[in-house]
Amino acid sequence: ITTLLGFRYDPEGFVRYAFPWGVKGTPLERVAGPRTWQLDEFKRIADHLQTDIEKARIGLPGSPLYLAISSGRGIGKSAWLSMLDLWVASCWIGSTSIVTANTETQLRSRTMAELGKWHTMSINRHWFEKSSMSMRPTKWFADLVEQQLKMDTQYYYVDAQSWSAENPDAFAGAHSQIGMMVQYAEATGIPDPIWNVTEGFFTDLAPLRLWIVISNPRRNTGRFFECFHKDRGFWQTRYVDSRTVEGVDGAVYQRIAGKYGENHDVTKVEVKGQFPTTGVDQFIGRTVAEEAAAREVTEDSGAPLVMGVDVARKGSNESVILLRR
């Protein structure tokens, strides 16, 4: 226990210690360690926690880390989330982690199934019991935490939560003064009301507050998209091209790019981890609009006066009227 608690501010150190990298006869016998992009993000989290420690030394409160990652297929997203789950549960005893996804099927058969795989390989797997939709401390460990640390364990878990856009309040209610992490898998498919409710999870001044959203970027609208655009001032972001990731078959991705072309939306979404240029209900693609906005126009007093009108129909969009000659 003491050794693992020493990795409280070092997720990479925990991951390297807790799993059997390169050990013969295990699922990781041919894997030397986490992938480069995963290590980069572990470091980002560690750096954020160190910054919070420095803030605490001068009497300032820490802050949540909001992290959005947009990627192509097959980079190891679920594996990375699972490693994070086990680090938080093991090194932040008493913490609460909430995991959700775009569908309950994704949540149950992909995200939480992956957590089960990593839990089975972990050096401290005897600390926790894993079910299809949660991971909680075993009775002996819960008793130890309650007796030695005088800490209630009712909210000490990694819990998979499904959601309903019509009843978002059912998703609310989780709080922790020890540590709070929320993960969105395939975040592009999670509706705005759930994002709104999640913001309330981080009101307690816990020393660990992480909101991790990760997805293939299937839509160029919605809150996941806005993490990289309108709301990018609040989020730390990253794009991951699948072809840059070790341990995957690069030929598969090159075949997709060769078939559709580098700038096709299929290549952007499935390989590059970039948002599609055109949405399903979008007549003019975003790239075309951005190029037009950046284009230098020479005024011609003899040309006809042209009015352009873009009528907003829903959400926070605004109607625009523009005159040009």
Language-model features, listed with the residues they occupy:
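Phosphate/NTP-binding elements of NTP-utilizing enzymes
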Residues: I1-V309, I321-R325
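Primarily the active-site beta-strand->alpha-helix module of PP2C/PPM metal-dependent phosphatases
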Residues: R313
